[in-house]
Amino acid sequence: MKIHEYQGKEILRSFGVPVPRGIPAFTVQEAVEAAQKLGGPVWVVKAQIHAGGRGKGGGVKVAKSIDDVKKLAGDILGMQLKTHQTGPEGQKVRRLYIEDGADIKNELYVSLVTDRATQKVALIASSEGGMDIEEVAHSTPDKIVTEMIDPLTGITPEQGRKVAEAIGLSGKSVDQALDIFAKLYKCYMDTDASLVEINPLNCDSKGDLMALDAKFNFDANALFRHPEIVALRDLDEEDPAEVEASKFDLAYISLDGNIGCLVNGAGLAMATMDTIKLFGGEPANFLDVGGGATPEKVTEAFKIMLKNPKVEGILVNIFGGIMKCDTIATGVITACKAVNLNVPLVVRMKGTNEELGKKMLAESGLPIIAADTMAEAATKIVAAVK
């Protein structure tokens, strides 16, 4: 789960990480009132969307008067902001953050992310923060510093000092960095985050550090422990199909192809998409119905897939372990009738009650194309949509 910058900064502030004063705004009038309350003389008007690259996309602007704030707020609110993370369609801006301007001297980068290979938390930092951090990571990876933190000990002063000095800090800035790193790590652990990123972490002309941006990703599996974080969720920033799927406990991710996929098990789902690609097709989604799918869940899965106008065919690939093939067959038949299916459907079933499931589909009177192997299933659905 992601949240907005202004929400992330409130979390950072609650853990003692220095951030500028700022006020969220949902209208131009609220933006003007926020600027008046902050007092100026310089403000930053920031688009709030769940994507990076806002500055390059024109979603972050500096204002030097209340009139500037009013004009910029009007320009940015409602715009379709396009960045390298939104895709070509962009993301509509529905919220702004009006913030005090900052004395920017040196933009640094710092983040925490779980490293599954080492089972530790990676503290990643760079002296080259700001809008071009992706290019820095690609072109000059030697400017990226990584320190692995053992969850049993947490971040040590020695580790913090090593990173701070590696990104060019000295004097009191090092001590401030140690404090920020420790608080950031506590924030990361206490909120069950999967990513906490500050870009940039500003070092001003006096050597003081402050987080000028905040990005959070949270582990969805741990959200039951954090109702206060769940309350920050902005459904307008999420794919409507994915939001709908989550209501039925379906793992769904939209893709750009034209072949809908319904599979049980994440590994099999990924293998199914790979096989479709191998035979010249393009998957329209990732959809894992899980091991406890009911006919009702299968029906909802079909409805969600078919809301995508790009879907020209559907491939159902089921391995019957805990999930019985006859249960899926019942769901497929019910779904086909409920949605009045009018695109080709290929079904491949293997495992528990396989023969019964196949018999039910064959006797359903529906134009369902059967397949015995993944290769056969992929070949048939690719041919059917061409």
UniProtKB/Swiss-Prot annotation:
One cellular component term from this protein's GO annotations in UniProt: succinate-CoA ligase complex
Cofactor(s) this protein requires: Mg(2+)
Binding site for substrate: N264, G321, I322, M323
Source superkingdom: Bacteria
Cofactor note: Binds 1 Mg(2+) ion per subunit.
One record GO biological process: succinyl-CoA metabolic process
All residue ranges annotated as the ATP-grasp domain in the record: 9-244
Cited NCBIfam families: PRK00696.1, sucCoAbeta
Entry similarity comment: Belongs to the succinate/malate CoA ligase beta subunit family.
Name the UniProt record assigns to this protein: Succinate--CoA ligase [ADP-forming] subunit beta
Naturally occurring in which organism (per UniProt): Paracidovorax citrulli (strain AAC00-1) (Acidovorax citrulli)
